[in-house]
Curated annotation (Swiss-Prot):
The protein's required cofactors: Mn(2+)
Binding of glycerol, residues: 121, 254
Keyword annotations from UniProtKB, A to Z: Glycerol metabolism, Manganese, Metal-binding, NAD, Oxidoreductase
InterPro entries in the cross-refs: ADH_Fe/GldA (IPR001670), ADH_Fe_CS (IPR018211), Glycerol_DH (IPR016205)
Name under which the protein is recorded: Glycerol dehydrogenase
GO cellular component, one term: cytosol
Catalytic activity: glycerol + NAD(+) = dihydroxyacetone + NADH + H(+); hydroxyacetone + NADH + H(+) = (S)-propane-1,2-diol + NAD(+)
Pathway as given in its UniProt record: Polyol metabolism; glycerol fermentation; glycerone phosphate from glycerol (oxidative route): step 1/2
GO biological process: anaerobic glycerol catabolic process
Keyword NAD: yes
Organism of this sequence: Citrobacter freundii
Amino acid sequence: MLKVIQSPAKYLQGPDASTLFGQYAKNLADSFFVIADDFVMKLAGEKVLNGLHSHDISCHAERFNGECSHIEINRLIAILKQHGCRGVVGIGGGKTLDTAKAIGYYQKLPVVVIPTIASTDAPTSALSVIYTEAGEFEEYLIYPKNPDMVVMDTAIIAKAPVRLLVAGMGDALSTWFEAKACYDARATSMAGGQSTVAALSLARLCYDTLLAEGEKARFAAQAGVVTDALERIVEANTYLSGIGFESSGLAGAHAIHNGFTILEECHHLYHGEKVAFGTLAQLVLQNSPMEEIETVLNFCQKVGLPVTLAEMGVKDDIDGKIMAVAKATCAEGETIHNMPFSVTPESVHAAILTADLLGQQWLAR
């Protein structure tokens, strides 16, 4: 099987990147259709529009109604056609960015995504999650290429709620461990082949960056300021983790995350918070050295990620609920089957309960 790595054509990061990106956007199109919800348009819209206008790029801004659905995508495409725009810019969170990607795909136009948070590694990916108008999952749209440009304005991201940056660290925490599992299993990644050494190296750099810079970056985010540590964590959460997961693969941690989504008491958690606990469970499942498990426990505690079921909200009927989670984790087609050994609901159940006890013991020290 071929080894494959993929990534956005261009990645920009730094304070005021959402204004400075125009000098690169002019190489993609001479007019852009810009979408954002009302809150984000007030927060960052002026910077983005000024960044385009300063390079003689025309644009039309349109309100995103909040759901990445086929109805909303088609509504926005109709408006885009009226204005004849030749590129798409999405500003905001995951659903806005996914909608921008979809519009660009269907209209065969270049896409620029400008996240206002660093809570997941999704912005760099060639993927959108499509929902119904009622907000229920409908399908994944897999694209033939990644966004043409990803723009991370760290001055904006530093002002976002700290918990979102920490959740991004939780998502990124899994990248190295899942990438290594997929590499060892010679699993097929979302890029359509086996992992390259380059993708695996980025995944490892992601983990090393989290350990070195994560706690410092959390303090910077609490102060609402940009520091070198925050810059490095934004890059780890977004670019390093994004290339690492897409071009190396997902395994135990994300499958366990998906299993936890069946529990109503976990619905308040962000994606990365569930993934962080899933990472601990994967480490138990693959019988990682105790030193490695304790390193991850220490990191999670210092930045504020959950390490016990109680912190996840699971406090009663634990055995039965975790067996249900384990069965969902092992469903056909789940990424748990990318682990380099056979996995059963029983082994996942055991790993989750053991991870919980390890977390309890760590917090009680």
